[in-house]
Amino acid sequence: MSSHARVYISNLSFEASENQLYEYLQDYNVISVLIPSQTVRGLKNKAVRPFGIAYAEFSNEEDANKVIQELNGKLFMERHLNLRMHIPIDSNKVQIVRKSSVAVVASSTAGADPSASSDTPAEAPEVASALEQQPLVKQLKSRKHRLTPFRRKKREEPAVEADIPEASTENVQETGNNETEVSEAVAGAADANAGANADANPIVTVDPVNSESSDVGNVTTVITEKPVSETIAFIGFIPRNTTDNQLREYFKGFDPQEIVVFKNRTYRRGFTFHRHFTAALVTFPDAFRLNDAKQFATQEKFRGKQINVKNAFIEKIEEVQRALEKKAGANTNGESAEGNNEIPADAGVTGDEPDTANAVAAIPIEGNPQPQADGNDGAVVEPEANAEPLIDQEDGVTASQDNPLLNSNAESQLESQQPVEQVAA
């Protein structure tokens, strides 16, 4: 162990270096200076960040005490230094103990009594085990929300122990009502053992003759793999913009029949974008050609990429067929919609619009007959030579040249009538 005196310095500037601090303490016979730091590794470079403390070693304790008395609280690089003697840590005296162990020791020592009965030591392990299990239960409760519903249900199911020691009624002492309880416990354990063995070795029974058999408890559901096609191959993650002609050229030695190229969409949890990948279904004449094509794909690359050819699932084939039917139906509806967009020639006028030709009344001037527009078909009707002048329906005044007011009104109405006659013509 070194006999040098060590001084602990805190509140040190983060920009201070060991050389600067050594020059600052060289008047006090300093031997060495150490500034602890940590290295932070980033993406491009590494940064060294000091902790803001330092350790300085001196030749004797007198110099160390002198430094503490004279430089404690002094300003160094815009910071007031805090100096004190360094106290080394004795590893033999430091004990790292968990909180649960401390609680167990405290409870056991607090209840210890030399004159106590022999039942007290027997209860201590039970208390210790119960206290040791508490942090585990809390941990499971905190992680309960992270489990999926299936795993949560499986975790909450009571565990059944398959290995249960055999118990005989001969070793059971008669203690009042305890004998009945022990016998019931033994019977329950035997039933649990039988149930565990039944679960460990399930028996599948099928009765094709009598479908309404009462022995339903022994029948278990057997989960099999998804059915696949023997002549249709599924090829996933092929290069983008792949055409059926390219795949037909690649599998030309195996006589491919029908090729469908489509895009699959996969969803990722936590991301806002969706991933699309191109896949294909290739139909071969028989299963032997399909197996040869699978072996061929392991040796030859397709457009510079290794592809995986495997038997297609029946549900995937049905899904692609539904998509094709939906697309064909959409195309058919689109063509019919384009035909219905043609507007007929006689549909330009609706029944809700007022008839402008019938709404305008023509009042010709006497002696200068004007043609009138027929309201039915828009034809111009020439007035008769001896036609009587029109009479105003409101006040019964006849329009003539003797009344200048009526003549002016008639002229204004004739001006408004001329555009209608031109439209009708």
Swiss-Prot record:
Keywords: Repeat, RNA-binding, Transcription, Transcription regulation. Residues 168-180, 330-339, 398-425 have a biased composition (Polar residues). PROSITE patterns: RRM. Coiled coil: none annotated. It comes from the Eukaryota. The keyword RNA-binding applies. Residues 109-128, 140-182, 329-425 are annotated as: Disordered. It holds the Pfam family RRM_1. One of its GO terms (cellular component) is ribonucleoprotein complex. InterPro entries: Nucleotide-bd_a/b_plait_sf, RBD_domain_sf, RRM_dom, Rrt5_RRM1, Rrt5_RRM2, RRT5_SRSF_SR. Residues 140-154 have a biased composition (Basic residues). May be involved in the modulation of rDNA transcription. PANTHER family: REGULATOR OF RDNA TRANSCRIPTION PROTEIN 5, RNA RECOGNITION MOTIF RRM DOMAIN CONTAINING PROTEIN. Belongs to the RRT5 family. This is Regulator of rDNA transcription protein 5. The lineage of its organism: Eukaryota, Fungi, Dikarya, Ascomycota, Saccharomycotina.
